[in-house]
C-alpha cells in the first residue's frame, strides 16, 4: 500500500515520555516525511524494520530536542516495544489501520460479530495496534449489547492472547473476589490453608487500581510478588500455592489493554467483568474456581437480583469452557478485617494465620468459609468435611507454616512494615450502635492518606456494624506519613466519616463516591 | 473536592509538542504532586489559577527538560488555551470529571438524553473539557441510535456553542455540498452570481481534511481566506458575499471537536452529518439553505433511498429551526470540472466565470442550476426566472466582476499559482468509451501527488464519462512538485487508474478506498 518514499526513513530517538499504554511517536514539523499527516494534525503511523511493524499515534513537535528533522521520537512504551537502538533508521509511513477495526465499526452499527472477528480484534488489542480512541470504540460499541456467543468468543480470545499456564494436576483450584470491599484479604488466608491441605492453588492477584490496596500490594509487604512464569511454576510445585502479582506473568494482556481504557471512562459492564475475570482464570489453568460476590449498599453489587444475574453469567461461561465455577454471595455491607492499606491488612492476615486472640473474626470466618468450598473439590475429602478441615489446618498452625514456606519461596519483601508516623482518630459523636459503614468512603479516605503508595498508610477500624460505641470513643484511626496527606485525609473525614451510628446519622449514600 | 496540597503548586513550562485537539500536560515522575496519579499511569488533571480551569490528560516524564520536579509542562494546545506565562505557579489536582460525562454513560446504556444534558455535553466539548476517549464515548454512544429530539437538541446546542452571525437582511442564502466529488467547486461560481444579483451569501467553507482540496484551499489560490468575523461582515456588506475559511470565524466549535475524533475513527453517521452541517449553517445566520447531495457509485451517497432519508433529515431539522432548506440530488458519478487540486480547480472556476470557450461545461451547468435555486429565494424575482437570471449574470461578466470585487475585499493571495513541474499522463489502454470514473481513487491519487499541501499538485482530466477515447490517448495528467510524490502517484495510478473504458475494464469498486 505504501511504497517507501526515500525521505520516509527516519532515525530513532528516545523520548522519555510515559504515554501509558498507547504507542506515541513524535516527528518534527519540519520533517520531509509524512507531510500530509503533519498537516492533518492527527494520524496513526507505522514504523517498519526487518518485518517488525509498530503502529503509533503521531504528535508533531517544534522542538529539536524531541525530534530533529531527520528523526522520529519514540515515547517510552513505543521505544520499549519496538526495541531498536537509538539512531536506527526506520521506515515511517501512514498507518494501514488494523482490518479488525471494520468489525468494530460493524458492532457500532449493531451487527453481531463472529468468533473470527472478535479473535482478530483481541489479537490486535493484545499487540497494541489500537489507539486509545479505537479501544474506546470497541468497548462502547459492545457495551450496549453483546450476545452469549460474543461473550464466549471474547473470553476465549482474551484467554488465548497471552501466557497460558498448564498444570500437571487434575484439580487446580482458584478463588476470585469481584472487589470493592476494603480489607477483605481472604486470599492470603485461603491460599495457605488450601496449599497446606495439598491442593494446588496458583494464585495471581492484581495491584490496587482505584482501591487502597490489592492483594498483590498487601502480599508485597511480606514477600516479593514480581515473579515470572517459570519461577511461579517452581514455587507452586514446591509449596502447592503462591500469592504473586498477575501483571508479571502476562495472563490475558488484552484484558489489561481494555481495562486501561475502561477505567478512565468509568465503564463497567457485567459482560466485560465476566470476560475479564474468566479469561484470566482460564489462562491461569485453574479447573475449579470460586467467585466471591460481596453484596451491600456501597459494594459493587447492591442487590440479590444483580448478584444472581452476574452469577449466571459466570456459570454460563465457566460451563462452556469446561471449568467448574461456583459463585457465592457474601456480606458486603462493611470492610472485612480491621485494616485498610497494605501493612494494616498484612497485619490482619498474619494475626488470623497466627491464631492471635485479637485477630479479626470476620476475616477468619470468611476465609474459612471460602477455603471450605475449595477443599471440597478434593475428591479424597469426605463431602461436607471442608470446613472442619480448613479450621483444623488454620488452628493447628499448618496454614501459618505453609504461608512461611510460600513467603520463603517467593523471596523477601523489600518494603517497610512501619505504619505511618502521623495519625488521627475519628470519634463517635454520640452514644449508640454502628448501623452502617460506607465502603467507598473508607476506600477513598485510605487512598487520600497515601495507600497503597505508602504501604503503611491507611485505616485501622475499632468498630464494626452492630458494635456499641460511646460518645468520644474512637471509631477508627487514620495513618499517614506526610503532613499534607494527613491534613487532606483529616478534612475529608471531617466532611463525612463513613459511619452511621444508631440512626442518628444519615445512612451513607452510594453517590458519596 | 480537592483542597490544595502545598506541593501541588507547579511552575508552568511550555512543551513544544502539538497534541492536536487534546490538552496534554507532563509532570516529572519525581514530582511530589499527584503521586497517586503518577502511579496509576493514566489520569486527567485540573490546572487552576484565578478561577481559570483547564482539564488535561497527564503524561509522565523522566526527562527534566520536559518537566523538572517542580514544573508542569503544557503541550501546545494546553499552553495556548491556559494562556499563562512560563514560570507561573499553578495549582494542579486530580480532575473532577465534567458532570456531563454521566449523561454520556447513560446514553451508552441506552437512555435518551434531555435537551439540558445534550447542552451540557456540547458546552463541555466546546470548552475542551473532554479527553479524546471521552469524545469517542459520546460519539459512539450516540452512533447506534438518537431520537429526533436528541438530534434537534444536538444541532441547537452545537449552533449556540460558538460565534453566531446575525445579518440585517430578511433573506440570507447559503449552499452546502456534502462532499466527496473531486473538483466540484460550484460555490466559487455560485457565490459571485448570487452576490452580483444582490442577495447576501456569506459563504464559509472548510479546508480539505481527507480530500485533495476544500473550497477554502482553492479560494486561497485567488485571495486571502483567513478572515475574522468583523472583517467578514464588512466584506459581505460591500460585496453581498464572501468565500472565506470557516475555521477562522469559529462557527460550531463543538463540531470541530467532534470531527477531530470522527475522522480517525472513520465514523460517519447520517445524524452526525446533519447536526454538523446544520449547526454551522444556523450559526452562520442563513435563512435559506440549499443542500447538494451528489449520488453515484463512488460518492458519499450511493443510492436514491439513502439520499431521500438524508434529505428528510435535513428538511426536518431545517423546519424546526425555522430555516428554509431545499435539498437536491446531483450527478455524483464523476468529478465536476476538469481540475482536481487547488490551482487546477481555481483555473476551472475562473474559466467558467470568464466564459472561456474551454471552460468545463459540467461545472458551468451545475453552478447555474444551484444559483438558479438560490436566486428564486429573492421575493422580487419572478417564479421560474432563476436560471435565466443566473445565466445572464454569468454571461454578461457581472459574476466575474463580482468575484474580482470579493477577491479585492478579501485581499491578495500569497500562494503560487504554478502547476507542479513534474507530470505524467495516464493513457487509454484501448479504444472505447469512458463508462465510469472512480471518485475515491482520483481523490486519493491527487492527494498522493501532493494536493492540497502543494497547491499546484493534482490532476487535469481530459476525458469524462461518455467520451470516446482511442488507445494511447491521455485520460488525465498528474502534476507533482517532487520526485517522490511523482513516483508514488505514478505507481498508485499504475495499480489502478480509476477509469473504466467501454466495459473492457472492471468497474471501479467503492472498496478501493
Curated annotation (Swiss-Prot), chains A, B:
Record key words, sorted: Glycosyltransferase, Transferase
Origin superkingdom: Bacteria
GO biological process: pyrimidine nucleobase metabolic process; pyrimidine nucleoside metabolic process
UniProt GO molecular function: 1,4-alpha-oligoglucan phosphorylase activity; thymidine phosphorylase activity
Entry's Gene Ontology cellular component terms: cytosol
Catalytic activity: thymidine + phosphate = 2-deoxy-alpha-D-ribose 1-phosphate + thymine
UniProt record similarity statement: Belongs to the thymidine/pyrimidine-nucleoside phosphorylase family. Type 2 subfamily.
Protein name: Putative thymidine phosphorylase
EC number: 2.4.2.4
Amino acid at each position: 500500500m505504501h511504497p517507501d518514499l526515500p525521505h520516509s526513513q527516519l532515525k530513532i530517538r528516545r523520548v522519555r515520555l510515559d504515554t501509558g499504554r498507547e504507542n506515541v511517536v513524535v516527528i518534527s514539523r519540519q520533517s520531509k516525511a509524512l507531510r500530509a499527516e503533519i498537516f492533518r494534525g492527527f494520524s496513526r503511523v507505522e514504523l517498519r524494520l526487518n518485518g517488525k511493524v509498530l503502529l503509533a499515534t503521531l504528535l508533531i513537535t517544534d522542538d529539536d530536542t524531541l525530534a530533529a528533522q531527520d528523526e522520529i521520537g519514540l515515547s517510552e512504551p513505543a521505544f520499549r516495544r519496538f526495541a531498536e537502538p537509538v539512531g536506527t533508521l526506520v521506515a515511517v509511513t501512514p498507518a494501514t489501520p488494523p482490518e479488525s477495526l471494520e468489525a468494530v465499526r460493524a458492532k457500532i452499527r449493531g451487527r453481531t460479530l463472529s468468533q473470527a472477528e472478535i479473535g482478530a480484534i483481541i489479537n490486535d488489542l493484545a499487540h497494541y495496534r489500537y489507539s486509545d480512541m479505537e479501544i474506546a470504540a470497541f468497548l462502547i460499541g459492545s457495551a450496549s449489547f453483546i450476545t452469549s456467543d460474543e461473550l464466549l468468543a471474547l473470553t476465549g480470545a482474551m484467554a488465548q492472547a497471552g501466557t497460558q499456564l498448564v498444570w500437571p494436576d487434575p484439580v487446580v483450584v482458584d478463588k476470585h473476589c469481584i472487589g470493592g470491599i476494603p480489607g477483605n484479604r481472604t486470599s492470603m488466608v485461603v491460599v495457605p490453608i488450601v496449599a497446606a491441605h495439598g491442593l494446588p492453588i496458583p494464585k495471581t492477584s492484581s495491584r490496587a487500581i482505584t482501591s487502597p490496596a490489592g492483594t498483590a500490594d498487601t502480599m508485597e509487604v511480606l514477600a516479593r510478588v514480581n515473579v515470572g512464569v517459570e519461577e511461579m511454576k517452581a514455587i507452586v510445585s514446591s509449596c502447592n500455592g503462591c500469592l504473586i502479582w498477575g501483571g508479571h506473568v502476562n495472563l490475558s494482556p488484552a484484558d489489561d489493554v481494555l481495562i486501561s481504557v475502561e477505567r478512565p471512562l468509568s465503564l463497567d459492564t457485567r459482560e466485560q467483568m465476566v470476560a475479564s475475570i474468566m479469561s484470566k482464570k482460564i489462562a491461569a489453568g485453574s479447573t475449579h474456581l470460586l467467585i466471591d460476590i460481596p453484596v451491600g449498599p456501597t459494594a459493587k453489587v447492591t442487590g440479590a437480583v444483580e448478584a444472581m444475574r452476574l452469577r449466571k453469567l459466570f456459570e454460563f461461561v465457566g460451563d462452556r469452557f469446561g471449568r467448574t465455577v461456583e459463585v457465592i454471595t457474601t456480606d458486603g455491607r462493611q470492610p472485612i478485617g480491621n485494616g485498610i492499606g497494605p501493612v494494616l491488612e498484612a497485619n490482619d492476615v498474619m494475626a488470623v494465620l497466627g491464631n492471635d486472640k485479637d485477630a479479626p473474626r470476620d476475616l477468619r470466618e470468611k476465609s474459612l468459609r471460602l477455603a471450605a468450598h475449595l477443599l471440597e473439590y478434593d475428591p479424597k475429602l469426605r463431602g461436607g468435611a471442608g470446613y472442619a478441615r480448613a479450621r483444623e489446618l488454620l488452628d493447628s498452625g499448618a496454614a501459618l507454616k505453609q504461608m512461611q514456606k510460600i513467603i520463603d519461596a517467593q523471596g523477601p519483601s523489600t518494603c517497610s512494615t512501619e505504619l505511618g508516623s502521623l495519625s488521627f482518630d475519628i470519634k463517635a459523636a454520640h452514644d449508640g450502635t454502628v448501623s452502617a459503614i460506607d465502603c467507598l468512603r473508607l476506600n477513598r479516605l485510605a487512598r487520600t492518606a497515601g495507600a497503597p503508595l505508602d504501604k503503611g498508610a491507611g485505616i485501622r477500624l475499632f468498630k464494626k456494624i452492630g458494635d456499641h460505641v460511646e460518645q468520644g470513643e474512637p471509631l477508627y484511626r487514620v495513618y499517614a506519613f506526610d503532613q499534607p496527606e494527613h491534613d487532606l485525609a483529616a478534612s475529608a473525614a471531617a466532611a463525612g466519616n463513613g459511619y452511621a451510628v444508631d440512626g442518628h446519622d444519615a445512612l451513607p449514600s452510594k453517590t458519596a463516591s
